[in-house]
Amino acid sequence: DDLTAELIAAAAGVPLVLHPDAEQHVRRWCGERSIEPNDANLKQAWLPEGAELIDNPVGSAVGFALDIAGTLVLTTPGVPSELRAMLPAVCARVTHKLGGGELYRLRLQTFGIGESTAQALIDDDKTHWPDDVVLGFRAGMPQLEIKLTASADTPDVQRCRQTLERLFGDHILGEDDTTLAGAVQAVLRNQGKKLVTAESCTGGLIASMMTAEAGASSVFEAGFVTYANDIKQSVLGVSEATLETDGAVSEAVVVQMLRGALQRSHADIGIAVSGIAGPGGGTDDKPVGTVWLAWGSADDLHTWHTVLPTDRRMFQQLVAAAGLDLVRRQLLGLPRLPHYFSRRAI
């Protein structure tokens, strides 16, 4: 039911025509999936007369470019994954239209620092930023992307890059599309080590984040999701007495969970978490949002406790992210952050 092509054709005062390359693209896409193309599929091949096709490498609907009275109009499908795949071609057309060269772009992925703090660090720094350098931020759970764009790669621009690396230091995970889990993977791979997880309140989210990254099999050993207390005992060897005395959300239990996971795998380092995700289950001593984490190796084990008063889904995401960063920092010999998302840390 997309009306984009029709409306742009009307604005340009030209008819819609069956674009042969677009038709071939639609038929090939359908054929690869054993689909007989119908009218709805083939409608995607009808473009404004004079339009130039923009290939879609992942979907059936192509994009197109059309000059309307000196204005370049570019269209893409609305599906985010398809848009991302087509952006290089779209940007190339815009650059060509404007007659400019290739822009210099730097995207630094950071963790553990907020946008306002990042801006304050930059504002307080005495570095001179060239006029053609544009800085920006894109906040996304759980990372902050710091973007630097300039008209060209010059020595001044490289000095700006070095300034960002100095200001944000060990908060930097990597460049471009590096994720927190991807950064952990890279360190594990460089050190020839493997990770094991033992999760209760996060329900396997840490393992899921790790295995969502390509190449996980070389660095991820196993993941134990031990939600119920009896499974903590039978699978990981957590003591019944410890559970009764300290409770499932306690330092003693996550330590035993971690030791059990390490003993039952060939992993070099592990992370264990147990908490109260809510909305119920909290007490005066252990309110909703309480979480204990244990991480490290058998002979170098650490624990940490915090309270994250938020909704259940966000709680799980925050705990998983904090756990991965704790592993990353231990592997790199870095101190843990003083707090993760909350200042109610102990």
Q: Which functions belong to the PLM regions below?
A:
Residues 27, 155-346:
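Short alpha-helical segments enriched in small residues
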Residues 13, 42, 48-50, 60-61, ...:
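Short coil/turn connectors at secondary-structure junctions
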Residues 2-98:
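Proline/glycine-rich low-complexity loops and linkers
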Residues 37, 97-102, 217-221:
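Short, structured loop/turn "capping" segments at alpha-beta junctions
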Residues 62-66, 146, 290-296:
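Short beta-strand scaffold segments in enzyme catalytic cores
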Residues 67-142, 149-157:
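Accessory alpha-helical/coil subdomains and C-terminal extensions
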Residues 1-15, 164-177:
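Flexible gly/pro-rich beta->alpha loop and the following alpha-helix that scaffold active-site loops
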Residues 2, 16, 20, 41, ...:
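Electropositive phosphate-/nucleotide-binding environments in soluble metabolic enzymes
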